[in-house]
């Protein structure tokens, strides 16, 4: 059975279930599978890259962000920013009186990254991260996981 798009996936699930009373909830099954994939799977097909100009203590994470792989300031790829916990971030700020300088560390906080030291000028940040799998629907009929590994669904 070839499964290459959302409709074929729904049809394959319906065939597997062999119960017409569950047809209406097949999209829910797919959504639950995607939630599990985003929570548990880390695969090269989920890797993404984003850039941003940073000039403040906090910077918003991409909306599809799951987990960092590597962050560095452009032009300094041999010196990636180091991921630290929020408690360690607080200790570093207190010890340095939060003097602005070139960022060396970052922490994850809700939908943002917190940088330390706070940037003293504009820096170009390059971020490699694991991205959420695009949600399948009638308008988004495929994604990298379905195309390359449909059995994960």
Tell what function each PLM region has:
Residues 1-153:
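Glycine-enriched, solvent-exposed interface loops adjoining structured elements
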């Amino acid at each position: 059975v070839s499964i290459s798009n959302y409709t074929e996936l729904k049809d394959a699930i319906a065939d597997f279930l062999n119960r017409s009373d569950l047809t209406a909830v097949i999209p829910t099954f797919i959504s639950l599978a995607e939630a599990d994939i985003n929570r548990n799977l880390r695969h090269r097909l989920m890797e993404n890259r984003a850039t941003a100009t940073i000039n403040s203590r906090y910077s918003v994470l991409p909306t599809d962000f799951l987990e960092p792989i590597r962050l560095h300031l452009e032009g300094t790829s041999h010196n990636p920013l180091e991921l630290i916990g929020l408690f360690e971030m607080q200790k570093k700020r207190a010890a340095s009186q939060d003097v602005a300088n070139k960022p060396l560390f970052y922490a994850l906080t809700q939908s943002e990254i917190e940088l330390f030291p706070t940037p003293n000028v504009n820096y170009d940040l390059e971020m490699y991260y694991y991205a959420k799998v695009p949600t399948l629907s009638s308008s988004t009929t495929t994604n990298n996981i379905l195309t390359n590994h449909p059995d994960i669904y």
